[in-house]
């Protein structure tokens, strides 16, 4: 059982040994060793770096291979052309390593592109460039003449900074009869020379002896140094001073303050007087120790006068001499050990770093390479390095005391744009010391964010009739990226509206996102537009986002109310509404119907009576437009009532339209016709003066034109007569070409072409000049033209029709109570209310409309000599052009209550033949047109 356990332990040890060797091999694989003698010239070859790194020489500069040195002086350099490591200056091994036997310089080789560190160790080989030397120029030794043979006297030590065989190897004493040389070993391996008395001295024979001490090294060639020694023979001094200890040992902390006592040596001499007084001094003291320690020659107290540094000198060995007044002395050794204290804080050196890193770089990206050193030893020199935990970075130890700072996760510039990384190094001393350094890192932007609109959708409003180029709305998209990646441009999608490209309606400023109208919008055409605004950044590749924008057109009060009923006829005539004199207050006469193309309150319509020939007789519904009687009709109320109705919307500013209504007030049709004659005579008197002026003006123009024609004709005849005379005198001449002037017939045609007609009607305030119209004033009206006259409406007492037609047309037709119309002239129904027993009121809408037209026409033709109205009061003739000029397909029938009492005429829809001969209308009224009533 025990054997098995031993075998298992051996197997484990073997496995651990293999692992250790593998690790050691991997460690050493990155360690490069070279050697170079000291004092070589600058640029001397040290080693082939490119070969040891496995790179071509031209790759060294490309990959950023460089030496990382912690010292102030760069002793080596890399030759990029040859790929060699060369010396960069003077190398003195004694200055670098002093008395250390093996001198190694360590440096690191950094490959920038991979951030790999390679250790390079260069051994400085010593050469024999220093000869042994003594500190004293001359040494004096006092020896009593009673000194017995074998007495030893200390001699000064020589110093050689070289090491090894080149260091101090031996001493030689010049030949003499009294003294010899012996070497005594020291604890550090060095040897002190001593002078040994070989025979008795006689002061009386020779008071002093001169000797030469020579020190030799082992170099090739051998170097040596010498110091003269003068031995003075003294009178009798029986006792030699004796130190209490042969060796004094003391440990001193390196941070001991200056002036502190280290120890006190003491030597006693039993002699009396001056021979018993001991004086203390250092012997063979090195210069470095003499700068730090001092010895009180009277008391033997050793003090510190300089500063100790464990990192430079850890141990001092000094020899102290005690000499009495008679010249006898003795020596002792003082060993001072410097104790390390944690007086050096760690040092952090940034070997390589980058100041910017692209966001979204993968974790593990190297940010910096740093080296941590502590000059202390032991735990005081053990250093740990760390960074704050909340940062997205971490430290990894690579080679020796090197660390690399890497990212631990993906960085986001939009969250943090830069980092101030604090690197802290702390040793394990008591108390621990620490050092800090900072690495500034900027996060470079990557186009990883599209533009973002603050809202998911937008609504914009623009009033209609806007000016072109008007600013409608402004959208803004934010891109959290920076620089070009955050430069946003705006555009619209390629859509169509009612088959028209969207770009013809609106445009957007690509830089500001302001939306502009390219044309004036009309609310009545379309009321809204759906747009999609695209925001695109300038990154590579560009990122974009879009948002919907609803553009609503706001209605403006740009349409005045449009009156549908009563419609304005194209020939300028007006319709007539009928109101019976027996109508009660509130009787519905007609209704004004209007619409407004706008919407909302811009389309709310109000009706009001703007003007009336008889104020207070009629009223208009504010919201309905119904025209009703406001009071009972009186006999004194005029037959013809004119009303001006205004229709106004509620827009800002309000728009309005007006319509003129003519209302005939009568109880019977004969009464209506009788009153119309008197009305026309009044109108005739009002316009007689104006008509006279117009006739005079036309006559004057005609006379001037006639004179012009006569002159033109005379000139033409004169030229014609002259040409005939020329033809008679020159019979051989060829015929003249046809003249370009017209003859008499042409003049007649000219006159016919430029003739004019003055048409004066009773209700017109101006004359109508009709051009061009042939003048047939000099011809008779044919029977055919009479037969083509317009149909007449014959009442019970028909008048004789004036004209130039057949006399049979002047015969009066027998009385008939039936009104007869052609199908094209049949009036519509204006009401269904019957009159009295003597007549029948029209019972359909079209009859009533025709009746209204006839009443207005009769009033217009009263003053015309060729009027078809004449004879009795019960006779009336109307041209077919005075028929209804409006349609009521959009207007409900509000005229069913129209009633004219006292009429003895009966209207019928029958299209039967008229009793008696059909009357024929005169041709004189063919060119006359009824005019609208003036207020």
UniProtKB/Swiss-Prot annotation:
Residues 30-134, 135-243, 244-348, 349-453, 454-563, 571-677 form the Cadherin domain. Residues 807-844 have a biased composition (Polar residues). GO terms for biological process: cell adhesion; homophilic cell adhesion via plasma membrane adhesion molecules; nervous system development. Residues 1-29 form the signal peptide. Residues 925-935 have a biased composition (Basic residues). Residues 805-844, 905-935 are annotated as: Disordered. InterPro entries: Cadherin-like_dom, Cadherin-like_sf, Cadherin_C, Cadherin_CBD, Cadherin_CS, Cadherin_N, Protocadherin/Cadherin-CA. It comes from the Eukaryota. GO terms for cellular component: plasma membrane. Residues 30-693 are extracellular. Residues 715-935 are cytoplasmic. GO terms for molecular function: calcium ion binding. Glycans are attached at residues 48, 255, 266, 420, 546. SMART domains: CA. It is found in: Cell membrane. It is a single-pass type I membrane protein. It holds the Pfam family Cadherin_tail. Keywords: Calcium, Cell adhesion, Cell membrane, Glycoprotein, Membrane, Repeat, Signal, Transmembrane, Transmembrane helix. The chain crosses the membrane at residues 694-714. Its main location: membrane. PANTHER family: CADHERIN-87A, PROTOCADHERIN GAMMA-A11. Potential calcium-dependent cell-adhesion protein. May be involved in the establishment and maintenance of specific neuronal connections in the brain. This is Protocadherin gamma-A11. It comes from Homo sapiens. The gene is PCDHGA11.
């Amino acid at each position: 059982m025990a054997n098995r356990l031993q075998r298992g332990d051996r197997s484990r040890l073997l496995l651990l040994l293999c692992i250790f060797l593998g690790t050691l091999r991997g460690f050493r694989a990155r360690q490069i060793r070279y050697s170079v003698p000291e004092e070589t010239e600058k640029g001397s070859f040290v080693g082939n770096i490119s070969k040891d790194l496995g790179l071509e020489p031209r790759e060294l500069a490309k990959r950023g291979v460089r030496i990382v040195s912690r010292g102030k002086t760069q002793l080596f350099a890399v030759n990029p052309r040859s790929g060699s490591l060369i010396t960069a200056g003077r190398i003195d091994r004694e200055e670098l390593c002093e008395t250390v036997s093996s001198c190694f310089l360590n440096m690191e080789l950094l490959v920038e592109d991979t951030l790999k560190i390679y250790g390079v160790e260069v051994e400085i080989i010593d050469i024999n460039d220093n000869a042994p030397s003594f500190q004293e120029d001359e040494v004096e030794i006092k020896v009593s003449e009673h000194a017995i043979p074998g007495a030893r006297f200390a001699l000064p030590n020589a110093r050689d900074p070289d090491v090894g065989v080149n260091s101090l190897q031996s001493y030689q004493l010049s030949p003499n009869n009294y003294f010899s040389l012996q070497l005594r070993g020291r604890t550090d391996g060095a040897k002190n020379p001593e002078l040994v008395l070989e025979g008795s001295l006689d002061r009386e024979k020779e008071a002093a002896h001169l000797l030469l001490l020579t020190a030799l090294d082992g170099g090739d060639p051998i170097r040596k140094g010498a110091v003269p020694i003068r031995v003075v023979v003294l009178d009798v001094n029986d006792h030699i001073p004796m130190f209490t200890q042969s060796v004094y040992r003391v440990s001193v902390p390196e941070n001991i303050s200056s002036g502190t006592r280290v120890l006190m040596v003491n030597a006693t001499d039993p002699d009396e007087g001056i021979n018993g007084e001991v004086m203390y001094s250092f012997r063979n003291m090195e210069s470095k120790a003499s700068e730090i320690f001092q010895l009180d020659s009277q008391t033997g107290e050793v003090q510190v006068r300089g500063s100790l540094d464990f990192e430079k000198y850890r141990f001092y060995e000094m020899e102290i001499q005690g000499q009495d007044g008679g010249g006898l002395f003795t020596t002792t050794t003082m060993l001072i050990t410097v104790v390390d204290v944690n007086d050096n804080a760690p040092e952090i050196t940034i070997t390589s770093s980058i100041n910017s890193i692209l966001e979204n770089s993968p974790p593990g990206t190297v940010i910096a390479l740093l080296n941590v050193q502590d000059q202390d030893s032991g735990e005081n020199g053990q250093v740990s390095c760390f960074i704050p935990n909340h940062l997205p970075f971490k430290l990894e130890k690579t080679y020796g005391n090197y660390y690399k700072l890497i990212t631990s996760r993906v960085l986001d510039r939009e969250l943090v744009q830069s980092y101030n990384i604090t690197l802290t190094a702390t040793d394990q001393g008591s108390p621990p010391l620490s050092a800090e350094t900072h690495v500034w890192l900027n996060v470079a932007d990557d186009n990883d964010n599209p533009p973002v609109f603050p809202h998911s959708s937008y609504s914009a409003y623009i009033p209609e009739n806007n000016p072109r180029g008007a600013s409608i709305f402004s959208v803004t998209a934010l891109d959290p990226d920076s620089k070009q990646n955050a430069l946003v441009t705006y555009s619209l999608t390629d859509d169509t509206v009612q088959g028209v490209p969207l770009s013809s309606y609106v445009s957007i400023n690509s830089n500001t996102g302001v939306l502009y109208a390219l044309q004036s919008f009309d609310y009545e055409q379309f009321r809204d537009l759906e747009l999609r605004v695209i925001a695109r950044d300038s990154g590579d590749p560009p990122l974009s986002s879009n948002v919907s924008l609803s553009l609503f057109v706001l209605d403006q009060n740009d349409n005045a109310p449009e009156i549908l009923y009563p419609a304005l006829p194209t020939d300028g005539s007006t319709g007539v509404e009928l109101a019976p004199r027996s109508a009660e207050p509130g009787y519905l006469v007609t209704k004004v119907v209007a619409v407004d193309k706008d919407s909302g309150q811009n389309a709310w319509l109000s009706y009001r009576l703007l003007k009336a020939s008889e104020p207070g007789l009629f009223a208009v519904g504010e919201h309905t437009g119904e025209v009703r009687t406001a009071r009972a009709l009186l006999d004194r109320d005029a037959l013809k009532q004119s009303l001006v109705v205004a229709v106004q919307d509620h827009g800002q500013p309000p728009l309005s339209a007006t319509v003129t209504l003519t209302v005939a007030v009568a109880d019977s049709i004969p009464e209506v016709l009788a009153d119309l004659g008197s009305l026309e005579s009044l109108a005739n008197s009002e316009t007689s003066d104006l008509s006279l002026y117009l006739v005079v003006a036309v006559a004057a123009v005609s006379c001037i034109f006639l004179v012009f024609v006569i002159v033109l004709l005379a000139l033409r005849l004169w030229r014609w007569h002259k040409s005939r005379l020329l033809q008679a005198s020159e019979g051989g001449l060829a015929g003249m070409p046809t003249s370009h002037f017209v003859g008499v017939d042409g003049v007649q045609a000219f006159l016919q072409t430029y003739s004019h007609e003055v048409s004066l009607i009773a209700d017109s305030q101006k004359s109508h000049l009709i051009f061009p119209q042939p003048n047939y004033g000099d011809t008779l009206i044919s029977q055919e033209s009479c037969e083509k006259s317009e149909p007449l409406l014959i009442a019970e007492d028909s008048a004789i029709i004036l004209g130039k037609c057949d006399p049979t047309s002047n015969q009066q037709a027998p009385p008939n109570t039936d009104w007869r119309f052609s199908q094209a002239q049949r009036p519509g129904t204006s009401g269904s209310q019957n009159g009295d027993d003597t007549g029948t009121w029209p019972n359909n809408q079209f009859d009533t409309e025709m009746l209204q037209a006839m009443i207005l026409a009769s009033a217009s033709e009263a003053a015309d000599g060729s009027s078809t109205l004449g004879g009795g009061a019960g006779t009336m003739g109307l041209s077919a052009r005075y028929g209804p000029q409006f349609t009521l397909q959009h207007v409900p029938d509000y005229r069913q209550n129209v009633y004219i009492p006292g009429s003895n005429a009966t209207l019928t829809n029958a299209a039967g033949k008229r009793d008696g001969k059909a009357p024929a209308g005169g041709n004189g009224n063919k060119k006359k047109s009824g005019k609208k009533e003036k207020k």
